[in-house]
Amino acid sequence: MKTYIGVDLGGTNVRVAKVDEEGNILQIVKEPTEVAQGTEHVINKIISMIEKIDGYADCEGIGMGVPGPVNTIEGKMVLATNLPGFEGFPIAKTISDHFHMPTFVDNDVNVAGMGEAMLGAGKGLPVVYYVTISTGIGGALVVNQRVVAGKNGHAGEVANIIIDRNREKVNYLNVGAVENEASGTAITRKGKAIFGDDKIRHAGDVFDLAREGNEKALKLCDEVAYDLAVMFSAIAHVVDPYVFVVGGGVMKGKDVFFDKMEAYYRTMIHKGMQTVEFKEAQLEEPGIVGAAMLPRSYVDKENI
């Protein structure tokens, strides 16, 4: 069975794993990123970690997931807020030159979407749209087991989709951007405005109040459900995926908003699109497994 190396590079920790073509993690190592010590230090750390993997030289390729937009053609980060010094650095080429092995880099949402499309909730389907609803909102379009990157590598990103112009200006995103209205951060912000900072620490506190029957919390969850439905309907009318795969920390509160969201969504799309399904993400380690699937997607032509 073929095996691949997956690298999950974050601002705090870096993980490297050997993964087989069925998505099983055969070996994994984890170390602090130590980004303050510089780009070269982090790259050398990744190289050292890969070399700790048994049989790494027999793997088919290396895939890396990183936090931020990526030029997937050049294998470079376009913006590296959590990894200072990595912006424009030739990550893929540096790793590939060292190991003489095909190496690919993409952002962490795209690799998670890749993992779900190939091995998780979207397995076997030709067009999968992955959405993660967490601190922010991200998306990835996977067609025939490849992430659609677009001209600038930003295809599939949904955070800035406008769901209602009649909202407040929150940050650099558009007024009414779905991330500012329905992400975990947005739910927390709105919950604090309603209930106070002392009662709301995170979105989970809002969900708990809704479960207790608190009318204001239920109303907020209903509004979030509607806003997400607007986003999903906009995506559906452009992409018409076979399935929406939804992951992220906010899904821990799915019992108080997700069915409502899907019901609203069904009223926003025409009859011919009602067969599009919603599924919850299935992979326990979508980041590192999805990263390992990048070389499988690009190198193993029989899998495409």
Where are these regions (language model features)?
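Glycine/small-residue-rich loop that forms an oxyanion/phosphate-binding "nest" at active or ligand-binding sites
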Residues: 109-110, 114
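A charged helix-plus-loop insertion that forms the helical arch/lid used to bind
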Residues: 77-86
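Active-site glycine-centered loops adjacent to acidic/histidine catalytic or metal-binding residues
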Residues: 8, 108, 134
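ATP-binding/phosphotransfer module of carbohydrate and carboxylate kinases, centering on a glycine-rich
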Residues: 1-61, 70-76, 93-103, 115-126, ...
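Conserved NAD(P)H cofactor-binding loop of Rossmann-fold oxidoreductase domains
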Residues: 67
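Glycine-rich phosphate-binding loop of actin/hexokinase-like ATP-binding domains
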Residues: 123-178
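Short hydrophobic alpha-helix segments
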Residues: 29-31, 81, 151
